[in-house]
From Swiss-Prot:
Main location group: cytoplasm
UniProt key word Ubl conjugation: no
Lineage: Bacteria, Pseudomonadati, Pseudomonadota, Gammaproteobacteria, Vibrionales
Family annotation (CDD domains): FliS
GO BP annotations, alphabetical order: bacterial-type flagellum assembly; bacterial-type flagellum-dependent cell motility
Underlying gene: fliS
Protein name, entry field: Flagellar secretion chaperone FliS
Cytoplasm keyword on record: yes
Length: 136
């Protein structure tokens, strides 16, 4: 039963991705990072080291992917600030994992929630535009 549910979730995510705008994909990645961080924190608190490592590793992968998508040439100060925040988050997650410190994960969760909240406020008419089209 569990395998069937996982397969269904994967098909659902795959179908959402295939029809998603770049804006929506970033929203999904941020939501996925938050979810993995919460799961990793719970595993940390329960002493479940394998699950903690797997979930925090996935959160790191997502954050590193988001960071790699930044356009430093087009994004100006916003891209530079996000780059610094993503770097901070990667370091915090790594240290939280090493020190087994859930509070450090709470800090990262709060930061990414704030970034996602700002991202969610972007009006729909801008969801498919490139930096050149916006005039950045």
């Amino acid at each position: 039963m569990r395998g069937s549910l996982q397969a269904y979730k994967k098909v659902s995510v795959d179908s959402q991705l295939s029809a998603a705008s770049p804006h929506k994909i970033v929203q999904m990645l941020m939501a996925g990072a938050i979810e993995r961080l919460i799961q990793g924190k719970a595993a940390m608190q329960q002493g479940n080291i394998p699950v903690k490592g797997e979930r925090l590793g996935k959160a790191l992968d997502i954050i590193i992917s988001l960071r790699s998508c930044l356009s430093m040439e087009d994004g100006g100060d916003i891209a530079k600030n996000l780059d610094q925040l993503y770097d901070f988050m990667v370091n915090q997650i790594t240290q939280a994992n090493h020190k087994n410190d859930p509070q450090m994960l709470d800090d990262v969760i709060e930061i990414i929630r704030e970034i996602k909240s700002a991202w969610d406020q972007i009006p729909p008419e801008y969801h498919n535009l490139t930096a050149a089209e916006v005039g950045i």
